Amino acid sequence: MILTPTQADLDLFAELSGDANPIHVDPDFAAKSGFGRTVAHGAMLTAWLVRAAGLSETPSSTSAMFPAPAFAGEALVVVHDGEAWQLARQQDGVVVCRLLLNAPVPSEEFLVVSSEASLPLKLGMTRESETEPKADTFATLQGLQSRAGEKPLSGEAAQILAGQAYMLGLISTLLGMELPGQGTNYLKQETSWLGSIKPGEKVHACVTITRLRPEKALVDLSTRVQNQRGGILAQGRALVSARDVKGAF
């Protein structure tokens, strides 16, 4: 299967999730970044691979790594290596997303660094959001995901997968827009899925810094999504690069 993330796809996912990180939607900003041009959201690539896996049941966890950028307009090939699902650039074979399904997700622990006192970013820094999905958000996400699906899904399964994609988008938004901020590059996201979004409910997302590695411009964070009653829907951890985030280190 060949999937090509167009700039229109990136703009649409940014609109649906709120993640307007300029490395995805601003060609001028991206041209000055380490990428040189706009790149696809890791959350969107994950949503595509989950759909491409053709699962009979929705996953209990997703563990995605993004070892290289997926550029807007470049074709990607879906590959299954027996253990993981991958998206690789058709042009050079470089893997841009590697996904494990239903694997254990370790908890994130706080790790202190000796130079933290002098850093703008601090352990325990948190950013939160509260959103209520629009009525057509999940239908639009289902349409975007369906491009990666060779097998039809039941209405309930498609709704749950769209909800998971939406929650990944909320986490991505906090990382890419607030903490560390604009220019953030997603490297890894591990998520346990503990519940699903109910129509008409507000959703609360939260990310918290748990580790800083200034020598590599890396930031580890815990990630969580809850419903309006406080029930945990998603819990996990993220690893990002703040190389292109102004003033991060």
Residue ranges with predicted function:
Residues M1-S60, P106-T184, K246-F249:
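Hot-dog-fold acyl-thioester-processing enzymes
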